């Protein structure tokens, strides 16, 4: 009985103290501080500071990457067998996948889709793939001396017709395929059902092999059983790299930083440095033209192709279109028509920002 009475007294004392504290708290004066009074560091300053942080366990990570390189031949074999490769694990897999493509996929054409971008135009990607496949088939027929013309061009620009062309039996060579690398297939611009269905149909095409990476823990929920086993035909590879998301993080505002609405030269330089040297050189030609012709609507696409081909930065219109698709996906270049009806390319940055961008690229 005494124990029960003691428990009741303790509970009464606790509840009484609780309500007394609430009364005192309600009567107390509120702080005059505001959330806007907090000093928020500049985003560029925060990124520069973060870039100086030394990576820990660099020796172990280097050994881990060396182990992954021994698996490159196996991954190529799996692609040739018709599987899609899905890379998952902690850390950015962008550098690993690109190293695999540059080291082991040299016998194939490779097209890269950056799923971490705010927007991705999949129809433009499919058009570029169809044009590239058409060129590959022409080259193979010339080298084999075949007189059969076959279907060398796709009949229309509808998504269904393009996918049918990519899936068609235009070549008996099982190794006649294009490797499509998708960084962050679970990225914000690709998470909608329509984009995932398009990618699944693309992956099931006979002339396409997919190498993709995911980072979101719930990424597998994007697909149903048919997509996983029959269309994507995934082989899952656990490849944690523990690498920072330097490039992928550029397009997302930092929680602790003050965001900027305008695209800065620093951000554009980081994006361009992730592209191929030829892609950077094509962009430099466009930037230099825009600085020397400030009163024009932009550089005509035909002029950019001629200038790039003269300097051996591109070998065909297909190659230039591939670079332009990357520029547009990164929102580095915009297109519009001038008074003569020509398609012109324009960099949506001020002249000072373009000059600073060229200085950053030349360093």
From Swiss-Prot:
UniProtKB keywords: DNA replication, Nucleus
GO-annotated cellular components: nucleus; origin recognition complex
Record GO terms (molecular function): DNA replication origin binding
GO biological process: DNA replication
Keyword Nucleus attached: yes
Pfam families tied to this protein: RecA-like_ORC2, WHD_ORC2
This protein's record includes keyword Nucleus: yes
Induction: Regulated by E2F. Accumulates rapidly after cell cycle reactivation by sucrose addition following cell cycle arrest mediated by sucrose deprivation.
Deletion consequences: Zygotic lethal mutant phenotype. Seeds abort early, with embryos made of up to eight cells, characterized by enlarged nuclei in endosperm with arrested cell cycle. These phenotypes are partly suppressed by mutation in MEA/MEDEA.
Subcellular localization, as worded in the UniProt entry: Nucleus
Recorded family membership: Belongs to the ORC2 family.
Chain's role: Essential protein. Component of the origin recognition complex (ORC) that binds origins of replication. DNA-binding is ATP-dependent, however specific DNA sequences that define origins of replication have not been identified so far. ORC is required to assemble the pre-replication complex necessary to initiate DNA replication.
Subunit comment: Component of the origin recognition complex (ORC) composed of at least ORC1 (ORC1A or ORC1B), ORC2, ORC3, ORC4, ORC5 and ORC6. ORC is regulated in a cell-cycle and development dependent manner. It is sequentially assembled at the exit from anaphase of mitosis and disassembled as cells enter S phase. Interacts directly with ORC1A, ORC1B, ORC3, ORC4, ORC5 and ORC6.
Annotated protein name in UniProt: Origin of replication complex subunit 2
Organism: Arabidopsis thaliana
């Amino acid at each position: 009985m005494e124990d029960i009475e003691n428990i009741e007294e303790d509970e009464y004392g606790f509840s009484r103290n609780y309500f007394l504290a609430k009364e005192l708290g309600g009567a107390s004066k509120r702080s005059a501080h505001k959330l806007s009074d907090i000093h928020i560091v500049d985003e560029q300053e925060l990124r520069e500071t973060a870039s100086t942080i030394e990576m820990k366990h660099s020796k172990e990570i280097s050994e881990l990457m060396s182990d992954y390189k021994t698996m490159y031949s196996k991954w190529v074999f799996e692609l040739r067998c018709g599987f899609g490769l899905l890379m998952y694990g902690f850390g950015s897999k962008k550098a690993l996948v690109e190293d695999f493509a540059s080291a082991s996929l040299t016998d194939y054409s490779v097209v890269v889709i950056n799923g971490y971008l705010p927007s991705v135009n999949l129809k433009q990607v499919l058009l570029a793939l169809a044009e590239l496949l058409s060129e590959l088939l022409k080259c193979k027929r010339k080298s084999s001396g075949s007189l059969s013309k076959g279907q060398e061009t796709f009949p229309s620009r509808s998504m269904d017709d393009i996918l049918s062309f990519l899936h068609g039996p235009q070549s008996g060579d099982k190794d006649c395929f294009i490797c499509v690398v998708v960084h962050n297939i679970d990225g914000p611009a690709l998470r909608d059902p329509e984009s995932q269905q398009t990618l699944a149909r693309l992956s099931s095409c006979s002339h396409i092999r997919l190498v993709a990476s995911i980072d979101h823990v719930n990424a597998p929920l994007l697909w149903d059983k048919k997509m996983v086993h029959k269309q994507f035909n995934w082989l899952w590879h656990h490849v944690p790299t523990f690498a920072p998301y330097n490039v992928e993080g550029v397009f997302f505002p930092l929680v602790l930083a003050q965001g900027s609405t305008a695209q800065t030269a620093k951000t554009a330089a980081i994006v361009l440095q992730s592209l191929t040297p030829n892609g950077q050189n094509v962009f430099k030609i466009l930037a230099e033209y825009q600085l020397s012709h400030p009163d024009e609507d932009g550089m005509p696409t035909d002029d950019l192709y001629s200038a790039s081909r003269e300097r051996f930065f591109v070998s065909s219109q297909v190659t230039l279109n591939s670079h332009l698709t990357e520029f547009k996906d990164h929102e580095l270049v915009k297109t519009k028509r001038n008074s003569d009806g020509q398609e012109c390319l324009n960099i949506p940055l001020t002249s000072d920002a373009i000059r600073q961008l060229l200085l950053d690229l030349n360093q």
